[in-house]
């Protein structure tokens, strides 16, 4: 069978992250805003008739049973009873473990793409439900919209954000999400916030002080980036970002990036490139269908 290529898995940044408390099951109650970016990883798929799932590229060092792309495909098989398999190739363009949602976005793209290619016919809501079983960030990528999020991050409300460009910097270290959320000194009692507070800039990242105190590279990157625009950490790190009104401003700052770090410029978008692809395929199917 032929390859189906150029399936995007876009990045996100957390415009803020408030921790409201901890649930009895140990998960934290959060408020955040997921800003989808126009940059990310890319996947390709080839349907297999034998039911096997084979992945290569990007994260070859990760065992298949720990890889979200394979786990997402297997979950879709098990849920629908589909007997088809797939070859999956991941072109990894985002830094691993940087707080950009790369693994979650990869899983969401697998669910959406194989749902189409296998003809399993699940709705977006059903796919988002499967995604939540894989990780709290997966549903926002399944829906493909910049959103306000609550709960563990799964209760989503699409929001409009200003048209901005972002300089995203990876300071060369990896921060463990589990370590951050288990930390004794982490703020866990923030008052609930509002979308109007976000728009007024009265928000923060509750994980940032602890990470800055324990990861010198993140602290240095935030200090450097703050020289150009208000900087903040995304998620639990290690990536940090700053917003700019114009692309040229962001690229001028990127040109001065210290050699030890990596960075890129991306635009914030309301709808993801994955959602755009799915809509384009549906429009094509509608045009080609019977009249």
From Swiss-Prot:
Catalytic EC class: transferase
EC number per UniProt: 2.7.1.148
A molecular function GO annotation: ATP binding
Keywords: ATP-binding, Isoprene biosynthesis, Kinase, Nucleotide-binding, Transferase
Source organism, top-level taxon: Bacteria
Function: Catalyzes the phosphorylation of the position 2 hydroxy group of 4-diphosphocytidyl-2C-methyl-D-erythritol.
HAMAP family reported in the protein's UniProt record: IspE (MF_00061)
Name this protein carries in UniProt: 4-diphosphocytidyl-2-C-methyl-D-erythritol kinase
Source organism: Alkalilimnicola ehrlichii (strain ATCC BAA-1101 / DSM 17681 / MLHE-1)
């Amino acid at each position: 069978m032929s390859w189906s290529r150029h399936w995007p898995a876009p990045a996100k940044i957390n415009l803020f992250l408030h921790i409201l408390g901890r649930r009895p099951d140990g998960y934290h109650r959060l408020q955040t805003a997921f800003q989808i970016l126009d940059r990310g990883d890319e996947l390709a798929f080839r349907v297999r008739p034998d039911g096997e799932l084979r992945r290569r590229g990007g994260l070859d060092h990760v065992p298949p049973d720990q890889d979200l792309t394979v786990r997402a495909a297997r979950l879709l098989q098990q849920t629908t009873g589909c007997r088809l398999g797939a070859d999956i190739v991941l072109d990894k363009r985002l830094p691993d473990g940087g707080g950009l949602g790369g693994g979650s976005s990869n899983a969401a793209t697998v669910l959406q793409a194989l749902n189409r290619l296998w003809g399993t016919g699940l709705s977006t809501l059903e796919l988002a439900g499967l995604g939540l079983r894989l990780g709290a960030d997966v549903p926002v990528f399944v829906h493909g919209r910049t959103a306000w999020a609550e709960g563990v991050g799964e209760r989503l409300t699409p929001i409009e954000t200003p048209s901005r460009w972002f300089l995203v910097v990876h300071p060369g270290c990896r921060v463990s999400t589990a370590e951050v959320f288990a930390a004794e000194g982490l703020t866990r009692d923030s008052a609930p916030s509002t979308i109007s507070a976000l728009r007024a800039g009265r928000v923060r990242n509750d994980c940032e002080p602890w990470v800055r105190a324990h990861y010198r590279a993140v602290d240095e990157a935030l200090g450097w980036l703050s020289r150009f625009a208000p900087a903040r950490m995304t998620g639990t790190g290690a990536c940090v970002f700053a917003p700019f009104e114009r692309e040229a401003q962001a690229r001028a700052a990127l040109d001065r990036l210290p050699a030890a770090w990596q960075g890129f410029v991306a635009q914030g978008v309301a709808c993801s490139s994955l959602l755009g692809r799915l809509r384009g395929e549906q429009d094509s199917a509608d045009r080609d269908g019977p009249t």
